[in-house]
């Protein structure tokens, strides 16, 4: 590997703002609602990316692995969330660390990292097999992981001691007065209105930026990432409240009032964080903002009442009802999905059959896949279920009210994935420009490596967006 004076190169910060949508971004900027996004866009080269995948391979945990490795799904083969460690290719941060640069990976989805990494790595909160590095990050990682994995559940499995340990960690690792004030306002608002708990996602990301900022100042990394997901969640759950005219299923006036601004609130919350990041890193750092993919309205289920999702209230109760008795460990993932890890393949195979035997009205209730000694499962029912629905075990007299074991996730699902994504690159040595031709996600890793003076590995077939002989095409500069 050839390295050309990395220490003299400009650092690179990769902002990973999952699934933000180009058309919504442009609309909110035009309305004057996102001043910091506008400032970044006006100083960047602007691209639209193509994920170059279609369902079932159009998923963020697949696309982000492509961004980080520079190879498509057909080569990295990572299909599920929390399986990032299975991809053999090195990530961008592995190559930077190997070249002698410090790295700070803050929340990147489906990540893995080489032993002895020069820097800090905080995996995404859905990771079940990845641990943060160094161990000093464990109090933060475990607290956020439980909050995110149980975000839709009223009962988050955290003790007073867990909260106290987390507060101690944050006080020593960047907790800002602004974030503390946001927490206080959120708790007061929840108590007064007895609702609005969904806004806690924005608070968690303020905390994440506090931590990112503290480590960034301490480490001064050559390459860093910062991942955010709250707005992707808002788009999935609340698109119908943003554009109710597109949907056939009516919503109550009360819910319309509460959720009509949820997506806008998500973009505005991220806009504030982007402003803080730009202030933190200054004007001399290369900033790359990517979304990997985006979303669009999900209208496919309107004839059957809209797309629904159901999640176990307590995984142990569902597993006991299914008749699974082998030693196991449950790891919630995203939304309704979860892993059950067993001690051997035989136990996992037996558990798979028991979960597949659960039915509602003659229809399978669970989608189940086994991967060696692990079982990946989720409720596969997508229609509205009546309160008196019964969950049954096939070829037995065992049954239980469905809602004794499951709850309906708030908001249903009214946003779905789209292969287009946002890519803005602010390079102090290049002119702002708008590029009309779409680019593949595989070009992002080579672009970052070239910016840092690191030769890309042979397995990366994509080309840098900044080949030395190709200048950017300038556009009229907009002063802000």
Language model region names:
Residues 11-18:
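Short, hydrophobic/glycine-enriched beta-strand segments
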Residues 19-22, 55-56, 72-74, 103, ...:
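Short, solvent-exposed loop/turn segments at secondary-structure junctions
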Residues 2-8, 79-81, 89, 94, ...:
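Membrane-interface soluble catalytic domains
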Residues 69-246, 250-253, 337-339:
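His/Asp/Glu-rich, glycine-adjacent segments
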Residues 36, 265-304, 423, 448:
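Metal-dependent active-site segment of extracytoplasmic phospho-/sulfohydrolases and closely related
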Residues 28-32, 119-123, 240-244, 300-311:
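Short secondary-structure boundary/capping segments
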Residues 25-62, 71, 102-106:
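Short, structured active-site-proximal loop/turn typified by the sulfatase FGly-forming signature C/S-X-P-X-R
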Residues 16, 48, 102-108, 121, ...:
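A structural signal for short, well-ordered beta-strand segments and their strand-loop junctions
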């Amino acid at each position: 590997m050839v390295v050309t004076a990395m220490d003299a190169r400009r650092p690179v910060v990769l902002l990973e703002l999952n699934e933000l949508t180009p058309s919504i971004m442009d609309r909110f900027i035009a309305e004057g609602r996102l001043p910091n996004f506008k400032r970044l866009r006006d100083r960047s080269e602007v691209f639209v990316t193509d994920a170059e995948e279609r369902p079932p391979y159009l998923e963020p945990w697949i696309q982000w692995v492509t961004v980080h490795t520079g190879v498509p799904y057909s080569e990295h083969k990572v299909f599920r969330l929390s399986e990032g460690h299975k991809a053999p290719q090195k990530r961008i941060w592995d190559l930077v660390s190997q070249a002698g640069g410090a790295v700070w990976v803050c929340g990147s989805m489906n990540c893995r990292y080489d032993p002895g990494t020069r820097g800090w790595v905080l995996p995404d909160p859905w990771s079940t097999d990845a641990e943060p590095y160094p161990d000093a990050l464990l109090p933060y990682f475990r607290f956020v992981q439980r909050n995110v994995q149980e975000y839709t559940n009223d009962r988050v499995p955290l003790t007073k001691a867990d909260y106290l340990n987390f507060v101690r960690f944050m006080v020593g690792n960047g907790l800002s007065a602004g974030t503390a004030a946001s927490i206080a306002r959120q708790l007061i608002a929840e108590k007064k209105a007895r609702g609005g708990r969904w806004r806690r996602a924005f608070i968690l990301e303020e905390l994440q930026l506090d931590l990112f900022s503290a480590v960034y100042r301490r480490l001064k990394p050559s390459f860093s990432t910062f991942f955010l997901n709250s707005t992707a969640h808002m788009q999935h759950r609340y698109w119908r409240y943003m554009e109710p005219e597109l949907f056939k299923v009516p919503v109550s006036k009360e819910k319309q009032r509460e959720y009509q601004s949820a997506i806008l609130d998500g973009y505005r919350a991220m806009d504030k964080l982007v402003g803080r990041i730009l202030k933190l890193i200054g004007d001399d750092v290369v900033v790359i903002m990517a979304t990997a993919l985006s979303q669009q309205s999900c209208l496919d289920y309107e004839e059957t009442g809209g797309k629904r999702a159901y999640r176990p209230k307590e995984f142990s109760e569902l597993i006991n009802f299914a008749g699974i008795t082998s030693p196991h460990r449950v790891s919630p993932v995203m939304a309704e999905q979860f892993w059950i890890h067993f001690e051997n393949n035989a136990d996992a195979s037996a558990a798979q059959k028991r979960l597949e035997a659960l039915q509602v009205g003659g229809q399978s209730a669970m989608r189940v896949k086994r991967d060696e000694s692990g079982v990946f499962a989720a409720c596969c029912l997508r229609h509205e279920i009546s309160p008196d629905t019964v969950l049954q075990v096939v070829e037995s007299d065992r049954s239980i009210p469905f809602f004794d074991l499951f709850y309906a996730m708030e908001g249903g699902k009214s946003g779905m994935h789209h292969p287009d994504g946002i890519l803005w690159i602010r390079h102090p040595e290049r002119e702002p420009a708008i590029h009309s031709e779409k680019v593949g996600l595989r070009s992002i890793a080579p672009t970052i490596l070239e910016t840092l003076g690191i030769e890309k590995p042979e397995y990366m077939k994509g080309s840098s967006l900044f080949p030395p002989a190709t200048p950017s095409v300038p556009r009229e500069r907009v002063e802000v």
